[in-house]
Amino acid sequence: MASRASWEYHGASQQSQGALLVQFSNGTIQSPESVNFTLYGNKDDKNPKTKRQKILAAETDRLNYVGNNFSSDTLKCSSLCRYFVGVLNKETGKMEVYDAEQFKMQPILKSGMENELHTEDIVDQPTKSYREKVDALIESFGTNKQKRALSSRKLNQVGSDILNKAMAKAAEEIIESRGTTELIKDAAEKREQDTSLFLPPCDFNADKPENAYKFDNLISPVEYAALETASAALRNITSEGLQQMVEEKKSGLFVLQELHGLREIKDEKALDHQARCLWYLDALIKLSQLRTVKRKDILTPECPSVVCWKLMKNFTVETYKNGRIQNAISGTTKTKIVAYIIAIALHICDFQVDLTLLQRDMKLKESRILEIAKVMGLKIKKRMMYSESSIEEGHKIGLLTIPLTVYKPSGGELKRKKM
């Protein structure tokens, strides 16, 4: 029979910091009792983004380590999760649970030059380089700002021959074990991920247009299910209701144009799918026109809360202004919104989307939306169409074809202006 235990949550009081979980990047500590830890906290307790910043320092006989909870080198922990540590007392059968925070410890490597400057005699100064002599003068007679800059530069220097040899040996072992081809492939994938932060997940080797930008990656199944009630008004729209939307200009030109053809769909399942997609697309277009986003701007009576939360999480960034945290639309997030709008519109329009209408709805420059469409692998064609005033004008159409189109950057040099 399995043993049972009761647990008691202690949390972390205002005086204590809770449990600290550390992970050393270069190995495992053999004797943890010989490590001295020091925790530093940010003094600015008024700013909600900096008051929780901490730095943890560890001293050992051989190396010193440092870690923090606010830089890019920290552990990739979800900000939406809380972490705990439990200590089980086998005699009483009780487990005490405490709040925990994780730190990734990095070694601080110095070249040894710092100690030599204090011990070497002045007679040995001619053998030093010009940079070493300047550093010695700064340490003796420099201003506080110069000394801080020098200290920062030395902390960032990794000039140890032992480390270089170890890194070279490790690189040789990795190349021998995995092979050069595999490493080049990994580097290409990493570079592709870094350059596509604002694009929807894309399969450039897709065999069908619908698999290039999969629908579930654009609108999650949870959001899609929640849109059933929200899109009911579009699904059951009448001629009078559509005319009222046109007069009140509640939606953009692209959505209104698709709503005209929505009433001609006889299949109930296809009609419901198009209505949900148009409702979500209309919400993204309205979101792209905002600078500062509040929940009340998105959470309208017909908007599901899960859709509101997803839009705030995926398409806004947190900024600190006027003493409080705000959600805003940055340049990168707006580009991401435009890319998702184009991808969803492709699914709505059988993978041929009128980029000119979307550009006007989002108040973008034509060159900007064409640039994003080209990065997404779309073919751009010009098609003559009639506007509401029966004037013939050229519209840019984006087509998704297999394989996706790859545009090479122009390598032409800029022409010099003649005087």
UniProtKB/Swiss-Prot annotation:
One Gene Ontology term from the biological process aspect of the record: RNA polymerase I preinitiation complex assembly
InterPro entries, alphabetized: RNA_pol-assoc_fac_A49-like
Domain of life: Eukaryota
Compartmental location: Nucleus, Nucleolus
GO molecular function: DNA binding
An example Gene Ontology CC term for this record: RNA polymerase I complex
Pfam families, alphabetized: RNA_pol_I_A49 (PF06870)
Keywords: DNA-directed RNA polymerase, Nucleus, Transcription
Family to which this protein belongs: Belongs to the eukaryotic RPA49/POLR1E RNA polymerase subunit family.
PANTHER family attached to this UniProt entry: DNA-DIRECTED RNA POLYMERASE I SUBUNIT RPA49
Function summary: DNA-dependent RNA polymerase catalyzes the transcription of DNA into RNA using the four ribonucleoside triphosphates as substrates. Component of RNA polymerase I which synthesizes ribosomal RNA precursors. Appears to be involved in the formation of the initiation complex at the promoter by mediating the interaction between Pol I and UBTF/UBF.
Subunit structure and binding partners: Component of the RNA polymerase I (Pol I) complex consisting of at least 13 subunits.
Protein name as catalogued: DNA-directed RNA polymerase I subunit RPA49
Gene name of the record: polr1e
